[in-house]
Amino acid sequence: GCIVAQFALADPYLSLRHLARAPDGTLAVALQAEHSDPALRQAAPALALLGSDGLNTVPWPLEGAAPDCWQGYAGDVCWAAGTFWVSATYAGQVMGWSTTGEWRGKLPLAGAGALMPVGNGAEGFMAGGSREALAAPTGTSATGSAGPHKRYRLARGWDNHGTLLSI
């Protein structure tokens, strides 16, 4: 094959780690910061979107600050329930953004790692954490206002990769 296009972020210390695609073709890239300065890692974005205007990082919400203990580490990304979901392992959250980078909010999950869409994502998603798994059905709001979310206790925590075989 041949290279058709190449994309890079301006910050060479942002590592492109995990990918998810929305039905409209937008590609989400979960990021991991490799800065030697802890303050720069903490301030780093979690997500970049590849669309018609190229590859661009997505800012944190209006407050502009990353969640406490973020440490620049996104464990996974998936498309489900109309949202790109990113796991923030050290911050203990699953965070949501739209295909245009609008903040949708967050769901708490200690040690959040693997994210798996249910079906094609239209039915929601599952997230694995260090002590429990979270099942978030269609209509899930990242503010936690919709649901209901089901939580399952885990004998072992899940890492940052997973595939849902059945539910």
Where do the protein language model's features map onto the residues?
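Beta-propeller blade signature
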Residues: G1-C2, A43-G54
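Surface loop/turn motifs at the tips and blade-to-blade linkers of beta-strand repeat domains
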Residues: F7-P12, W60-W70, G105-A110
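Repeated scaffold domains used in trafficking and secretory/extracellular systems
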Residues: Y13-A20, D68-D76, A110-A122, H149-I167
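Short coil/turn segments that connect the beta-strands within blades of beta-propeller domains
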Residues: D24-T26, A81-G82, G121-E123
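Residue position within the beta-strands of beta-propeller blades
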Residues: V29-A30, V86, M126-G128
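Short loop/turn segments immediately following the C-termini of beta-strands
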Residues: Q32-H35, T89, S130-R131
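Short, solvent-exposed loop/turn segments at conserved positions within beta-propeller repeat blades
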Residues: D37-P45, T89-Y90
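Short loop/turn segments that connect beta-strands within beta-propeller blades
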Residues: G51-G54, S98-T100, G139
